[in-house]
Amino acid sequence: IFRDLLEAMEGRDLIAACNVMAEDPPSGPHRFEYGPGVECILIPTMTLPPSTHTNCFVLGERGGQRAIVDPAIRDEDGYKLLKDKVEEIRGDGSDIVCTIFTHRHQDHLGDMDMISQIYQAPVWASEETLAALPEIQETRKLREGDEISIDGPSGRVDWEVLETPGHCPGQICLVGEPGVVAADNCTMVGTILVPSSDGDMGAYISGLERLRDLRPHTLFAGHGPLIPNPERMLTQYIEHRKARHAKVLQAVKSGCSNLSDIAISAYSDSPGANPALAQDQALSHLNELVRTGDVRKTGERFHSENPPHQVDGSSEGSNGLV
């Protein structure tokens, strides 16, 4: 509505512009503009509650080149949303130059057969993500430091690839002047899991630190609203994960050896935490502790050679996060 008001104010004062809009109100599809040249489509997906949608981003200006990030459609509702947006993009005289996937999880990776019925464009993603897709004729393997340039009426906007593989192998972010397309690193809705199956807790924390060091003014998260001035939130995420890491280590040092007991001890400050998720996240921390040599694993049990002692940060609350 703000953009419509600015257009109505050309050659008019504010009152006259409001009168023009009252006589001829804006019509047509609503555009969720998260930033300059960054539109969002809310795609319904089977993601982790409380989230119900995945953010599909359309990069670029109207009338210029466009890139579609994470078109995660897998049902008729998502198909219609993407189809309507693509028709709108074409009506603006824009060309879709590529499809970008941030990572291979199913709530971000769309059904390529459905997508190809709507539009055709090269697929750009990391090696790990491309390997999870069916054979596609035209692809580009994205790596750390690669640049994606999108031309528009106002000029060219460059996005740089940043690898943040902790949540998922091959996950990437896109860093540009409008902000950072941050994939599944943090969110204002719920929390981010680091799956014990293929996640990497050490890499996840390092990725958060890299994002914070960029001091971005906006994060475009994979789920939920945009995150303005995200440095504080990223710091909270980092401190929370490090505190939880310390609590898992302390649980092992205190004599807990099986996963269930370790999770109960490490999440004693979060009695409402889902037991299965708490165990999975505890295992992700344990995998990292085994990798760094702080914990050894024998069969299904975990041990530490060091005597029990208080670990810095082990008493810090979780605020309900995992």
Q: Where are the language model's segments positioned?
A:
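Conserved beta-strand hairpin/beta-sheet module of binuclear metal-dependent hydrolase folds
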Residues: 29-89, 173-185
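Metallo-beta-lactamase
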Residues: 66-68, 73-76, 147, 154-247
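Active-site HxH/HxHxD metal-binding segment of metal-dependent hydrolases
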Residues: 52, 73-158
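Glycine/proline-rich low-complexity segments that form flexible loops, beta-turns, and polyproline
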Residues: 10-23, 37, 132-138, 146, ...
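C-terminal regulatory/interaction regions
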Residues: 3-4, 8-20, 25, 250-322
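Residue-level signal for inorganic ion chemistry
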Residues: 59, 82, 223, 248, ...
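Histidine-centered divalent metal-coordination motifs
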Residues: 98-108, 167, 171, 223, ...
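Aromatic/hydrophobic pocket-lining residues that form the small-molecule binding cavity
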Residues: 82, 204, 208, 282
